[in-house]
């Protein structure tokens, strides 16, 4: 998987988390994403949706988790309410250069990602509110 694929919050359910990394992730929201996938694969879409709504009700998750939850709900036939559909969780900008493409993503949770055309990148995490001023 290309790291850029992780920026948009629109991966298919079998890639969030990747099957190969399930043993490496623990806690929420990962456990709920995995349970939702298992329910959906087993044909129990109502329980799958329930898990995803539980994720949406969790506080202080990365914006990308909320985006993924809505992506999965849409694949299960559920659309967000109008006010939620307009909620902006982040912005991804791709800039084409002669040398390649630079990509920057900024999210509502004050995190950001940057990939330079050279392949170098930056992951900006925001551990506290000290930079909000």
Model-identified regions with their sequence ranges:
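N-terminal domain-start interaction segment
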Residues: 3-6, 11-17, 24-26, 31, ...
